[in-house]
Amino acid sequence: MTKPAVQKNGLHPRNRHRDRYDFPTLKHSYPALIPFVTVNAYGDESVDFANPEAVKTLNQALLQHFYQIEHWEIPDGFLCPPIPGRADYIHHLADLLAEDNRAVVPREASVLDIGCGANCIYPLIGYREYGWRFTGSEINPIAMKAANQTIEANPGLNRAIRLRRQKSSTAILAGIIHKNETFDAVMCNPPFHASAEDARQGSQRKLHNLGLDKRSPLNFGGQQDELWCEGGESAFIGQMIKESAGFARQCLWFTSLVSRKENLPEIYRALEAVDAEKVRTIDMAQGQKQSRFVAWSFLDTAARTRWLQKR
């Protein structure tokens, strides 16, 4: 008898990954996954999430099966993102845009992804789900090369996704948004940790949660610019907020993930300091993990509606 699908608590209603992974279907669709699938102590098929190669292959299977991405590779040591959570950001952002567009998610919206990474995951999902056009910024040349290889290896992506190199280590939006250029939304998954030591301790906590020895050579992935920056998440978002004021009429919504809830008061103060017209906090959840993104606009409701009607 086929087991009933068990839904993952809290994921967006349109998220394709609300049910537990259907490994029989994924193995049939993407045979390279077969060697990594085993039966766990509960009698369910799964993969070893402590094995970076297994996690990457699972992502390849999910991208191929759900999003028709036939070729996706990331270099060793780069972040391998959990796709369900990344998809949730896209779907909640779509709802935010729909609020100003008579409850209709705009097609072919123009979106800027700050720090798209080697995985380029937000542009891939956003384009396949909603036909959005993406500009991805990236400071790491190796990551940018890998993302470009994915774009060129999959037919049609190069007409929807373009990448721009961020040449300044201190800028986020500056140098990426061109004069007279507009975006319907800006999205960002900022570096989480405040130092390399914080990042190392975060990896050790993951090892502990997986029941592994701290001396394990496990590589969870993530380059310096992906994992940490001076001052951590709060400082990065604060800089993004300051820069956003200079592009107040070029972007409808600015958004950023906020991993640490305790950073919200400081973020709200920064938004008040730049006179943001509208601020929203969108809560998200995946099982026991709680997350959110903060969105802000310098346009009032009427101006935001006019913006989308003129697209």
Curated annotation (Swiss-Prot):
One of its GO terms (biological process) is rRNA base methylation. It comes from the Bacteria. GO terms for cellular component: cytoplasm. One of its GO terms (molecular function) is 23S rRNA (adenine(1618)-N(6))-methyltransferase activity. It holds the Pfam family Methyltransf_10. It is found in: Cytoplasm. InterPro entries: METTL16/RlmF, rRNA_lsu_MeTfrase_F, SAM-dependent_MTases_sf. Its EC number is 2.1.1.181. This is Ribosomal RNA large subunit methyltransferase F.
